[in-house]
């Protein structure tokens, strides 16, 4: 589905990623962990074409449709949840109100709440970020610290959603300090000192 080949990235001569190789196949769930600043977000941003790599390539199949929750998804702070989700989904002409309402209900967010997103709590914003990453039925999804700010009940909802999506053939990559005990990972990796190391037994 997607292949990362010999990716390197430095910032001001500080090497963050060194010769990163990774293959993601259909229906897999990958877990990447490492210390703060180890390069997890940078790797995701390169794969999602948000920033450029210094060298190396990304190969992906033509039918690969990427969804991602990496830091701020580009929400318009003065607008409502509904406006933001409709706006983001309409960019790629994949707006499906029934699907979005279903996800909002799943995460206990009021789709019709007229309040601006800037007034949302950290946890509510986190839920909105998760929703925008999956609402267009993307088939390859990247989550960077997805459970930050979530309560235990919402973490369980997230874990169940991930397992359900993987069963449906979606591919998911999670970068997190928390392993999320109920997610069924296919492969586990440690990102340390710019190197991505498999921890599969």
Give the role of each language-model region:
Residues 72, 78-94, 99:
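Q-loop/switch helix immediately C-terminal to the Walker
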Residues 33-35:
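The feature captures the beta-strand-to-loop junction immediately N-terminal to the Walker
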Residues 97-112:
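Conserved ABC ATPase "signature" region
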Residues 2-4, 17-19:
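Conserved structural motif at the start of ABC-family nucleotide-binding domains
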